[in-house]
Amino acid sequence: MPRPQVLLSGVRFSVIVPLFNRPDEIRELLESLTAQTVQDFEVLVVEDGSDRDARDIVSAFEDRLDVQYFWKENERQGFTRNFGFERAKGDWMVVFDSDCLIPERYFEHVGEFLDQHPDVDVYGGPDAAHPSFTPIQKAISHAMTSFLTTGGIRGGQQQLGTYQPRSFNMGISRKAWEVSGGYRITVKGEDIEFSMRLIAHGLKSALIPEAVVYHKRRTDFRQFQKQVEFFGRARVNIRRFFPGSLRPMHWMPTMFLIYLLALGPFYVGGLVLDNGWVTFGVRMAFVPFVVWYVALFFEALLKTGEWRVAFLAPRAASMQLTAYGWGLLSEYVAVVVLRRRDSIIGEVRPVPPIPSNPPRP
């Protein structure tokens, strides 16, 4: 039996989904939106110069959703979201990645939160793994959200005022759009730069714990490694706009990478020297990694109840930290130390200046 519709007082949402060569994903996303307990929203699917367009797929949902399809030349995701913002009619503009599935009470939870916090102009929500995801997808999801990795830093805690949402699950009020001018860069940390600038304008942001989306991320470890390495490079790009934003905690994955790389020579040195104290030192050097690895295994097992996911989760977490650490380190050396290249990909669009004394969020 379908869940009865919930009515919200005076709030209309515009859902904006940038899309590039992923017609199957948009079908699943739109299908999940048809089951929402709150249906007072429009959907804008913006095809970003795809070779495999999803026009027919989107059209098939016109009798179940207030949905519009747009095709434009390729500008990548940041400016594609701006394209959607410019055409949205809602009071709130919600951005999802095309590889997300939306639980049926998503807008119900968001609407209730916004009713209780009318001063909030920006929000984000966490992500989780859907039961239908593959073991690799579940392991990747666990690695990205675990307290034992950078997930504990990125968004495992509720913050009211200064939370920095990510664009796979983010909402902004019309006021926030008008004040900020949208995305300044189109890729390589565009969502973090946007979130930081919104807060710098004095707008209040919040994490809504109940506003969960099921985020597929990547389907194999090779794709995941490339994606996370790019995240590390993007952090250096953000430094260009917010010089103080690259903090010691962002270097933790790089330190993890250096630690792992040092274990090999340390182990070989212990074998060559064949000294009791050296051997003991070598064994102790491995203890932190072994403890962390085992803790991740049992954390994943307790959370998912799946042995295969538990075996894959430490591998995913190790890949996440080493790839991010390498991306950050290599980009920092190339851009900041050696000055061999610009960190920006594409154009930087003009946006309204940040006031010198903005109101505190």
Identify the function of each model-found stretch.
Residues 1-35:
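N-proximal low-complexity "stem/linker" segments adjacent to membrane-targeting elements
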Residues 11-14, 42, 193:
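Cell-envelope/extracellular polymer assembly enzymes that use nucleotide-activated donors
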Residues 32, 39, 47-56, 74, ...:
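A conserved acidic beta->alpha catalytic loop
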Residues 72-88, 109, 160, 167:
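Glycine-rich, basic loop-to-helix element that forms the pyrophosphate-binding segment
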Residues 93:
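Short aromatic/hydrophobic "clamp" motif used to bind/position activated sugar donors
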Residues 105-138, 212, 216:
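Conserved donor NDP-sugar-binding/catalytic core segment of glycosyltransferases
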Residues 184-246:
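Catalytic donor/gating beta->alpha subdomain of glycosyltransferases that bind UDP-sugars
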Residues 256-337:
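Membrane-embedded multi-pass helical conduit in multi-pass membrane proteins
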